[in-house]
């Protein structure tokens, strides 16, 4: 393990695929089982990019001060801010970085899923329930919940049926993202490429680096949006578009401050 780590950290391997050969214990039976792991080194981003490197944009601009030594600007979304020291340990940083990117992607999909049905319903498209936090209760209705409105696909009147479908749909994709599959191996679980990039958006390294920054920035906004949707649902019992319409109609009485000052515990 130590030798592999040293080999991967050597600059002479930058940009090349590194193959790790097995030990003798990995050779079993009548034939040889050779296990290889391909590690792809990210191509350096142009020094002119404002989002990477020591001269990148910081969280407070010129008033940010010096960033921690372990925040070098190598990864997208690094603004040099880590007052709690969450990124000081490399292994913890790698884990948290993966968690953030995955949550960003789900939050962007979730925010779209919260707003889009309401938007369609306001434009004449009929839904059983367009408000996101009420939609799940349709499985308890007399007709149940049909995937894509087609009872021959999944006619769900059970939370277990919904759960099973989600495990299959989400678990298969996540498993392929991490471990690869019949369509090809995955060298980077965060940015698998290949079948996950049919448009070839990652073909140009500099454009890809820019897209990574856009993804993490929009994803962070989406996570805050989802938090706001949850709070709105608890406080007002309405969806995000309904709350927006109410606020625009009467911004003085329909805002966060008004609801906070009118809140009485136990009522």
UniProtKB/Swiss-Prot annotation:
Binds at least 14 chlorophylls (8 Chl-a and 6 Chl-b) and carotenoids such as lutein and neoxanthin. Chlorophyll a 3 binds at residues 138, 148, 215. Chlorophyll a 5 binds at residues 214, 232. Chlorophyll a 1 binds at residues 81, 87, 100, 220. Keywords: Acetylation, Chlorophyll, Chloroplast, Chromophore, Magnesium, Membrane, Metal-binding, Phosphoprotein, Photosynthesis, Photosystem I, Photosystem II, Plastid, Thylakoid, Transit peptide, Transmembrane, Transmembrane helix. GO terms for cellular component: chloroplast thylakoid membrane; photosystem I; photosystem II. Chlorophyll b 5 binds at residues 166, 263. Residues 1-35 form a transit peptide. Chlorophyll b 3 binds at residues 158, 174. Its main location: plastid. Photoregulated by reversible phosphorylation of its threonine residues. The N-terminus of the protein extends into the stroma where it is involved with adhesion of granal membranes and post-translational modifications; both are believed to mediate the distribution of excitation energy between photosystems I and II. There are at least 16 genes for the major CAB protein which can be classified into at least 5 small multigene families. The LHC complex consists of chlorophyll a-b binding proteins. This is Chlorophyll a-b binding protein 7, chloroplastic. It comes from Nicotiana tabacum (Common tobacco). The lineage of its organism: Eukaryota, Viridiplantae, Streptophyta, Embryophyta, Tracheophyta.
